[in-house]
Amino acid sequence: MQNIVRTAQVVERFKLQVIAGEEGLHRPVATPDLSRPGLVLAGYYTHYAKNRLQVLGKTELTFYASLSEEKRRERAKILCTEQTPGILITRGFDIPKEIEEEAEAANVPLMRTNAVTTSIESQITNFLEMELAPMTAMHGVLVDIYGVGVLIKGQSGVGKSETALELVKRGHRLVADDSVEIRQTGDQLLVGSAPKLIRHLLEIRGIGIIDVMTLFGAGAVRSHKKISLIVNLENWDAGKVYDRVGLDHNTMKIIDSEVPLLTIPVRPGRNLAVIIEVAAMNYRLQNMGINTAEEFAERLANAIQDTEGDL
């Protein structure tokens, strides 16, 4: 699912001052990439990225002021198209009257901010990348365990929320329960968050819905987290062979990214919170180049080889 971001959302998020073209605030912003239209102001229109937010800083405005009035008017008309989501003036600079008049005539939102050009560019790009990223929703619980984003999945009633509650009591942080919104950013990272309606809430059968932040404090929750590991909880199946060494490397595809997947069988007496906690720590160790399962397999192979040599 692809989200739609409109210029009005950018204005609200970054507290921008709207100077002209308010009727165009409903225009969609189709890409997180911004445009510094220096070449357009210089008269080269061939590759004008008119569907991007246009950012005019000190360099562009200084050059624009050096043009004749006729050229300023011409370039302003080129800037303001039906597809242009908006024009942003940075550093609080005065707005050339030609740009203001053409923006108003074409209903192109003309905005201004006191922020430095490079700073506001970076902030808006990050905001748009997150909002426009491909998104899906999955049933599960997302918890930050020792800095590792662990998505706990499983059938309804298997104990996901109860396990998350125990993890929160052990000092870890809840991101989302029941429904996890997952966005894939430009660098193929999966970032999970909770829908606004159920943010910081946890459903425990027999108790009901609890507010984790109210009960355990602000340190027990976070708004979003990169998903690094998926743990699938399933009822113990005596006829199924589960990985007992750790050499199996399974993954699960979410959008376009593959995420490591562990399957943990559930049966009475197993402390799932501790097991998942250890799984997160083991994942961190593997990222540091320490793989206990592979080291054990290597030692075992060496021992067998030595034994065969003695025969």
Curated annotation (Swiss-Prot):
Q: Which Gene3D superfamilies match?
A: HprK N-terminal domain-like (3.40.1390.20), P-loop containing nucleotide triphosphate hydrolases (3.40.50.300)
- Segments carrying the region annotation (Important for the catalytic mechanism of both phosphorylation and dephosphorylation) are 202-211
Q: Supply the InterPro entries for this chain.
A: HPr(Ser)_kin/Pase, Hpr_kin/Pase_C, Hpr_kin/Pase_Hpr_N, P-loop_NTPase, Ser_kin/Pase_Hpr-like_N_sf
Superkingdom of origin: Bacteria
- The residues that the entry says bind ATP are 154-161
| Residue numbers spanned by region Important for the catalytic mechanism of dephosphorylation | 265-270
Tell me which family the UniProt entry assigns to this protein. Belongs to the HPrK/P family.
- State the function annotated in the UniProt record: Catalyzes the ATP- as well as the pyrophosphate-dependent phosphorylation of a specific serine residue in HPr, a phosphocarrier protein of the phosphoenolpyruvate-dependent sugar phosphotransferase system (PTS). HprK/P also catalyzes the pyrophosphate-producing, inorganic phosphate-dependent dephosphorylation (phosphorolysis) of seryl-phosphorylated HPr (P-Ser-HPr).
What name is this protein filed under?
HPr kinase/phosphorylase
The taxonomy runs: Bacteria, Bacillati, Bacillota, Bacilli, Bacillales
